[in-house]
Amino acid sequence: MAKLTVKDVDLKGKKVLVRVDFNVPLKDGVITNDNRITAALPTIKYIIEQGGRAILFSHLGRVKEEADKEGKSLAPVAADLAAKLGQDVVFPGVTRGSKLEEAINALEDGQVLLVENTRFEDVDGKKESKNDEELGKYWASLGDGIFVNDAFGTAHRAHASNVGISANVEKAVAGFLLENEIAYIQEAVETPERPFVAILGGSKVSDKIGVIENLLEKADKVLIGGGMTYTFYKAQGIEIGNSLVEEDKLDVAKDLLEKSNGKLILPVDSKEANAFAGYTEVRDTEGEAVSEGFLGLDIGPKSIAKFDEALTGAKTVVWNGPMGVFENPDFQAGTIGVMDAIVKQPGVKSIIGGGDSAAAAINLGRADKFSWISTGGGASMELLEGKVLPGLAALTEK
């Protein structure tokens, strides 16, 4: 990576500003999935082991008005992080002001402080999300000229807590997580060991147009599953029953199929039900067509076999988006089948591009079998699309 990393700077005795991604799910104030906190530990531990004073910034959820702050404090995260680090984490509970400044100035080498949810600054004019210049300068002033960005999950956004701070420090560098994310995903797409197979699922073609176009150029095969299958079907005149379809994207789907040179591989059957919820009948279709009054909610057994065959011998696989409504046991066979087909390939470099795919791998017990599971859904999608990420572009060149 042509950007400076946390290993390229002297941290001893320095107040080091760190953007992490602690946007974790909370239920009644309890963290239900701590993966993002765990993923940030190597960078935080390295900073404090080097004698730095780590000042952490993160958002949590969306905050637009005062009422939205309810249940969005990072206090539970501070407690969880303290337990994981085995040391106190200072949590002043504010995003600016004398209370924060005094707590930072009182830090000693090897200590950690967590600033309150950066999006609390969005209540008064979206200062965080709109990369307010004054806020970026203020947060940058709290440190000693070093900023570490380790939040891949927000690298596709230009916010005050990443791009804003970067613009106002002497050195803006990548943390270990950001470095790994970029290395795995960018290398997989730009310099893959071949055969390179991409698998794209999810419900909407509109979300993946740019990704499909980019991967059709880079990959040897692009397998399509999930709800967007039926937009591709309808574009070819195949009956789809009551399945999800984006009527305004039929021409786009047709165009992608025509210019794919056979690289785009669609399912050949579906698991259909007579309703999305409260269904009384679930069955496999004979072929591509979905029955009248039914909707496709997963790829079928013939498609699983076809995708298994398409993945045989693959050396690089990038997967983004489940094959069906995997949260429901009746419609998770396709996602499980594809996961198992990926991980059984000898010597394969297998990458999950965040979001629902990551949740599927974790929930269905396959996470440890993949080479890399991205922590950022939107950011990984934009990398797969070949876009430049603002949070990465803002870092200091080597």
UniProtKB/Swiss-Prot annotation:
InterPro entries linked to this entry: Phosphoglycerate_kinase, Phosphoglycerate_kinase_CS, Phosphoglycerate_kinase_N, Phosphoglycerate_kinase_sf
SUPFAM superfamilies in alphabetical order: Phosphoglycerate kinase
Subunit structure: Monomer.
Annotated localization: Cytoplasm
GO CC annotations, alphabetized: cytosol
PROSITE patterns per the UniProt record, alphabetical: PGLYCERATE_KINASE (PS00111)
EC number: 2.7.2.3
GO BP terms: gluconeogenesis; glycolytic process
Reactions this protein catalyses: (2R)-3-phosphoglycerate + ATP = (2R)-3-phospho-glyceroyl phosphate + ADP
Positions with a binding annotation for substrate: 21-23, 36, 59-62, 119, 157
Highest taxon in the source lineage: Bacteria
GO molecular-function term, one example from the UniProt record: ATP binding
Recorded name of the encoding gene: pgk
Keyword Ribosomal protein among record annotations: no
Keywords for the protein's UniProt record, in alphabetical order: ATP-binding, Cytoplasm, Glycolysis, Kinase, Nucleotide-binding, Transferase
Similarity remark: Belongs to the phosphoglycerate kinase family.
Pathway named in the protein's UniProt entry: Carbohydrate degradation; glycolysis; pyruvate from D-glyceraldehyde 3-phosphate: step 2/5
Name this polypeptide is given: Phosphoglycerate kinase
Residues the entry annotates as binding ATP: 208, 296, 327, 354-357
